[in-house]
A protein has these predicted regions:
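Noncatalytic, beta-rich nucleic-acid-contacting surfaces in large DNA/RNA-processing enzymes
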Residues: 1-606
């Protein structure tokens, strides 16, 4: 690729972003549902609601800003301008993070550290980035100001940095230092400044790239803050057909936001996820897309929606069978619709429909085909009332599955639990007891020992070559699934606890050697519901070394933000200190995760 550039040819990278489709789909849904034509290219870049969302770290689904470490950084930085958003894009990369620039930027912005410049003359150049050269353009301006570089010379310096060409950087040293001396700066300072620039060469980022990505990040955050139902519907549509963990994360985020995601409904659902904001007294919700149901193709969905749009909602299952195109009455597709709950609103039970739908379809198809061929009823009259056609109709029994079976069928057809979840009522315990979620494991260190909670959805036991027993299990939490490997030694201790549909907490080591992260099981314990494991106090260990006054200030702020009914005890060395009746917290509000970010994963002793 270097030879192509040397020939003078232009090299351009084109990046296809799914998020651009999410933005355009959101704009269409906003126009359809509330009649607002939003000009996405001219949004106000000082929107308070958007910055509040980002400062709280509520950025799941926001371009570039949704990973757990990024959300933690945003809470520390509290972005309040578009420039902060662009800086986040540049800072959240291995180089700047290894140099602790991301924390320096956050601390300097919020007056936790003084803003320092390598020379007073640099203030006018680096004031907007708090004295840090986080962009290549910052380095170019320093070279022009301090070494008298022309714009072309500064651009050559930028190229050397951007391509990480160390040899080219060394060639620049002599011209840079001599240039600074000619500008009246001493030799020592010139060496120091070039050394600073050389360090930044490892991670300085292109400003136009950061601002371009930052704008898309801001636009998606704005849409989530102001039009959450439409945005989340478009976001979930964008991951339709992708790995199910993606949609599970966004489904859980909808629940966190207080948005209901309803099972698909033959009377209200569209091809894709759709915001249902005209629901009478009910809060706005998102209805699951019909085409996202397993075994239900887009062709069938188009025919179904066409009939509904032409002749109104379906009255019951008999009416549905009588009206839709015969292609829709595909047994495989109808079974999938039933299991997914798409006929629930018609007043039928899922078990009742599964017991009778084949006979109803057979009866309907036979009669409709006879009618098409000119075969009339006994009285040679076609009644207008569908119920008259079904004088001998097959009855739908009023029987229903147990909750677990209904949810199992939902997951089979939709890839995830929608109407409910086996872990509903366990959320607080999961936050208190666990260090990570299934989807957070991939960002942890190899070999790190963690606790992850969930429900066991699959157990596969097998014998090793030596005849010993081991197992692999699928553990599902509210964000997705992760594979847990139980080797022989652990199997002897915990094998009796491994059963499908059982809520458990797994203690294990992170294994990231393969493409998909796994957990090597060490222990398994029962996961108790929030009601069973209700706590009256929490214990927080504060490290004896490395804890600063700022850490303690952040602790006080967190405890104040998460006020509740639980007492708080702080462990300092061998002392256990009660913080008093005025300091009580809600441990299920996300506090424990914040404390782990502040003091480390092992700080919660409760």
């Amino acid at each position: 690729m270097q030879s192509v550039e040397d020939l003078g040819l232009l090299k351009m990278d084109f990046l296809g972003l799914r998020n651009l489709d999410v933005i355009s789909d959101s704009l269409e849904l906003i126009k359809e549902t509330v009649g607002v034509e939003l000009d996405i290219d001219n949004l106000p870049l000082d929107d308070e609601k958007t910055f509040n969302l980002l400062a709280l770290g509520e950025s799941i689904g926001v371009f570039q800003l949704e990973s757990p470490p990024m959300r933690a950084l945003m809470r520390a930085l509290a972005p309040s301008s578009f420039e902060d958003v662009a800086a986040l894009v540049a800072l959240y990369r291995p180089g700047p993070m290894a140099a602790n620039m991301h924390n320096d930027y956050a601390d300097r912005k919020n007056n936790r550290k003084p803003v320092e410049y390598f020379h007073p003359d640099a203030e006018e150049l680096l004031r907007d980035t708090y004295g840090l050269m986080i962009y290549q353009e910052s380095v170019m301006r320093v070279a022009q100001k301090f070494a008298g570089y022309t714009l072309a010379q500064a651009d050559n310096l930028r190229k050397a940095m951007g391509k990480k060409i160390r040899s080219a950087m060394e060639k620049e040293r002599e011209s840079f230092t001599s240039g600074m001396e000619s500008m009246g700066y001493d030799t020592k300072l010139s060496e120091e400044v070039f050394q600073v620039i050389s360090q930044f060469a490892d991670y300085a980022f292109n400003k136009s790239h950061s601002y371009g990505y930052g704008l898309v990040a801001y636009q998606t955050a704005f849409l989530k803050a102001h039009y959450p139902v439409q945005y989340m519907a478009a976001l979930m549509t964008s991951v339709k057909g992708r790995k199910k963990e993606d949609s599970a994360i966004y489904l859980n985020e909808c629940r966190h936001m207080g948005l209901e995601v309803a099972v698909p409904d033959v009377n209200t659902a569209q091809m894709n996820y759709y915001p249902d904001i005209k629901s009478g007294n009910r809060s706005p919700r998102i209805v699951y897309g019909l085409s996202a149901i397993r075994n239900v193709g887009e062709g069938i969905v188009s025919l179904l929606i066409s009939e509904r749009n032409s002749n109104g909602p379906f009255v019951d299952f008999y009416d549905f069978c009588e009206r839709v195109d015969l292609q829709v009455l595909n047994r495989r597709a109808i079974e999938a619709l039933i299991k997914a709950g798409a006929f629930d609103s018609l007043g039928h039970t899922r078990q009742g429909l599964l017991a009778s739908y084949e006979q109803i379809i057979e009866q309907t198809v036979s009669r409709r085909r006879e009618k098409e061929m000119g075969v009339m009823t006994l009285f040679e009259v076609a009644p207008d009332d569908v119920s008259q056609v079904f004088d001998d109709k097959v009855l739908i029994p009023e029987i229903e599955f147990e909750k677990q079976q209904r949810l199992s069928f939902e997951k089979e057809m939709l890839g995830r639990y929608i109407s409910d979840h086996p872990l509903r009522g366990y959320e607080g315990t999961l936050r208190r007891k666990c260090d990570a979620t299934s989807q957070g494991v991939s960002s942890l260190d190899e070999g790190q020992v963690i606790k992850v909670g969930g429900v066991i959805t699959e157990v596969n036991k097998k014998q090793t070559q030596r005849g010993d027993l081991m197992a692999t299990i699928s553990l599902e939490d509210l964000e997705g699934e992760i594979e847990v490997i139980v080797f022989t030694k652990a199997m002897a201790q915990v094998g009796h606890k491994l059963a499908t549909d059982r809520p458990v907490i797994v203690t294990g080591r992170v294994d990231r050697r393969d493409e998909n992260s796994k957990i090597i099981c060490l222990e398994v314990e029962e996961l108790k519901s929030d009601q069973e494991s209700k706590v009256t106090s929490i214990d927080v260990r504060i490290p004896a070394t490395g804890t600063t006054t700022k850490h303690l200030e952040n602790l006080a702020s967190l405890l104040s933000e998460h006020a509740g009914e639980c007492d708080v005890y702080v462990h300092l060395g061998s002392k256990r200190i009660w913080l008093g009746a005025d300091v009580r917290v809600d441990p299920d509000s996300g506090l424990l995760g914040e404390l782990r970010v502040l003091f480390g994963a092992e700080c919660i002793l409760t």
